[in-house]
Amino acid sequence: MNKKPLAIFLMGPTASGKTDLAIALRQTLPVEVISVDSALIYKGMDIGTAKPSKAELELAPHRLIDILDPSESYSAMNFREDALREMAEITASGRIPLLVGGTMLYYKALLEGLSPLPSADPEIRAEIEAKAEQIGWSGLHRELLAIDPIAGKRINPNDSQRINRALEVFYITGKTMTELTAQQGDSLPYNVLQFAIAPQDRAVLHQRIEQRFYKMMELGFQQEVEKLRARSDLHKDLPSIRCVGYRQMWEYLDGDISLDEAIYKGICATRQLAKRQITWLRGWNSEITWLDSLDPTSSKLKMIEKIAQNSIKL
């Protein structure tokens, strides 16, 4: 039986030092970096996403950044397909894929595969919405309870979006959302070493986030969002503009809040994102080696030692 090739996950909350550590590893190990970040995929969104600088990218080129226009959408399934392709290319060249980022849903999709849920069907969605106008979303929720009791109990009767999706899946496939999500996708054909980096003191992370946000403002974050807002095809409901920081700055430019409020809300939203990322990592089912952001040298050595223990020739 062929031995699975090695892949490395370097996960962690925003502002935890993932990029710096990835660059350090790139100077030592035969690795190629793949970004695992739902914001870095967008072109023209450099400052607010803390995208690696030109100098950093010269030291450690990142795959899967700047691959989409902000008007486009991107799913976990899209990421899995793209990442697997990039990983295969890297492995074929005799190097090791190093996947770096904080979008935990992408890691989960890559590691475990995806349930075979169908793509959205605009016609069926329109039919469901027309029916909702007749009997209300509460009526459709009762219909969902009859079709898929488990999903119906989990979904709030006022959550029209999720009710619509659950019914849409059933109308398209003839199977319930519960049935389909129980079907696991293909697992990742790699021997994966998983690392997570974060400061042991949460207050340090909060301080880093605040400092980084003010630094982004100095670098021209407001002007970056102004440029995006000047485009007629972009609006605040797009996934790209819903990224933390961008949404709050957009609200300021719309005149809904003051600049100070936008900065404060942006910092708070980023801290909340970091909290969700850490919570997800704490509940991660797979084995993770934790690294301390405040000791990057030790973190690098710890990763190298772990890789060596797995009989990988460096």
UniProtKB/Swiss-Prot annotation:
Query: In chain numbering, where does the site feature Interaction with substrate tRNA fall?
Result: 103, 125
Q: What Gene Ontology terms for biological process does this UniProt record contain?
A: tRNA modification
Q: Which UniProt keywords apply?
A: ATP-binding, Magnesium, Nucleotide-binding, Transferase, tRNA processing
Main EC class the enzyme belongs to: transferase
**Which EC number(s) are documented for this chain?**
2.5.1.75
Annotated residues for binding of substrate: 14-19
Q: Which reaction does it catalyse?
A: adenosine(37) in tRNA + dimethylallyl diphosphate = N(6)-dimethylallyladenosine(37) in tRNA + diphosphate
Task: Spell out the residue ranges making up region: Interaction with substrate tRNA.
Answer: 37-40, 161-165, 242-247, 275-282
Reported function: Catalyzes the transfer of a dimethylallyl group onto the adenine at position 37 in tRNAs that read codons beginning with uridine, leading to the formation of N6-(dimethylallyl)adenosine (i(6)A).
Name the HAMAP family for this protein: IPP_trans
Subunit composition and interactions: Monomer.
Q: Which family does it belong to?
A: Belongs to the IPP transferase family.
What is the protein name stated in its UniProt record?
tRNA dimethylallyltransferase
